[in-house]
A protein has these predicted regions:
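Beta-strand-enriched, solvent-exposed domains that form extended recognition/catalytic surfaces
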Residues: 1-46
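A short C-terminal boundary segment appended to hydrolase-like catalytic domains
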Residues: 15, 284-335
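N-terminal active-site segment of His-dependent metallophosphoesterases
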Residues: 27, 32-117
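Extended active-site neighborhood of metal-dependent phosphoesterases/phosphodiesterases
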Residues: 41-44, 118-193, 222-227, 231, ...
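Beta-strand-turn-beta hairpins that frame and shape the catalytic cleft
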Residues: 43-53, 61-67, 157-167, 194-200, ...
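Acidic/histidine-rich helix-loop elements
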Residues: 56-89, 145-152, 173-180, 215-221, ...
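Active-site glycine-centered loops adjacent to acidic/histidine catalytic or metal-binding residues
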Residues: 57, 110-111, 141-142, 204, ...
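His/acidic metal-ligating clusters that form di-metal
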Residues: 94-105, 175-263, 313-335
Length: 335
């Protein structure tokens, strides 16, 4: 059984398509559920000012999960005949869950599509725009610009109750990797210097941070180029209003630290295992990140089929994608 979510008032466990959900709990309190001792997150001081939801790697138009280029190894999962496309199943279930928390904003951090085709973007818009309207804020990912498309390009500054979001366009059209220009970093620096509230920075590509397997600097790094990553970390070091950078792209949950101590966060994809979206609870004294596994029966049936994608390549996708609980559910303190 997976312990998937722990918030300040919520604990959720999953086993297959079975969900055990415990609500209305007390913060920083240990409970015994399903034979496990589980402690809820502490609640930051002050009032709850807003809730913000994010998704990434939603991939409308994708028809095969687990496919790597032209390889036949997998396992590769496809929707059965007569079933709706799995991006529709996963995203429509995510939208229903997100709408239930009444967020002040829904941020989409790229890879709306499989190949940036008009019908794929139209499917994304049909799913997300009607329920959220002007609260929906979108930036592109690499899959949206492989043919040089310009849809959803550009940086955005989004002011919300208790927090601002700096949504960065990290895409290099025609490329898988990402970067940030000096002009973008100056824009972020100027906005952070003038900000009258804490700021979360978001983008599609994850940051390069030295350590582990990342000590080799390369412009072929799968995420943000190392020089741009370092420059982003330098802005964070100068501007304590910047609390965290959160990205997608890797289809995993992970938290690392910049040299200044600010967290650099990756959030998993909507489209396959474990199939998640993230909630940010903004309090006067800090922010709680709560990752939710999409839990409709049809969504769980699909995401469970994807638990062992890439197994034939020796990849433990289950562990990689799910990450540690503290990577999914954590407190982001004020700096």
């Amino acid at each position: 059984m997976d312990l998937t979510t722990v918030a300040d008032d919520l604990i959720v466990l999953h086993e297959g398509t079975t969900v055990a959900r415990y609500e209305h709990l007390q913060p920083a309190t240990t409970y015994s559920f399903m034979g496990r001792e589980i402690t809820t997150l502490p609640r930051p001081a002050g009032e709850l000012l807003s809730r913000v939801a994010t998704v990434n790697d939603v991939h409308f138009g994708e028809v095969e999960a687990g496919r790597i280029d032209d390889h036949t190894e997998g396992p590769i999962q496809r929707t059965a005949a007569g079933e709706p496309p799995y991006p529709e199943t996963m995203n429509r279930s995510a939208v229903r869950e997100i709408a239930a928390i009444d967020p002040v904003a829904v941020i989409v951090k790229g890879d709306l599509s499989q190949d940036g085709q008009p019908q794929e973007w139209a499917a994304f818009e049909a799913c997300y725009r009607p329920p959220f309207g002007e609260a929906l804020h979108v930036v592109r990912g690499n899959h949206d610009a492989y043919q040089g498309q310009q849809g959803y390009e550009g940086d955005q500054w989004i002011e919300l109750p208790g927090v601002a979001v700096a949504l960065l366009d990290t895409v290099l059209p025609l490329h898988t990797t990402g970067s940030l220009t000096a002009e973008q970093l100056d824009w972020l620096d100027a906005h952070a210097a003038a900000a009258d509230r804490p700021v979360i920075v978001m983008g599609h590509h994850q940051q390069w941070i030295a350590g582990g397997n990342n000590d080799h600097r390369s412009q072929d790094y799968f995420g943000l180029h190392p020089d741009a990553s370092d420059a982003l970390a330098d802005v964070f070091a100068r501007r304590p209003q910047l609390l965290a950078y959160t990205a997608g792209h890797t289809h995993r949950h992970r938290v690392r630290r910049m040299p200044c101590g600010a967290p650099s966060i990756e959030i998993g994809c909507v489209k396959d295992f474990p199939g998640t979206w993230a909630e940010y609870r903004v309090y006067e004294g800090g922010i709680i990140q709560v990752v939710h596994r999409i839990s409709s029966r049809e969504a769980l049936a699909w995401s469970e089929r994807c638990r062992h994608l890439y197994r034939d390549f020796g990849i433990d996708y289950e562990s990689y994608a799910l990450g540690a609980l503290e990577d999914r559910c954590c407190t982001i303190p004020l700096r």
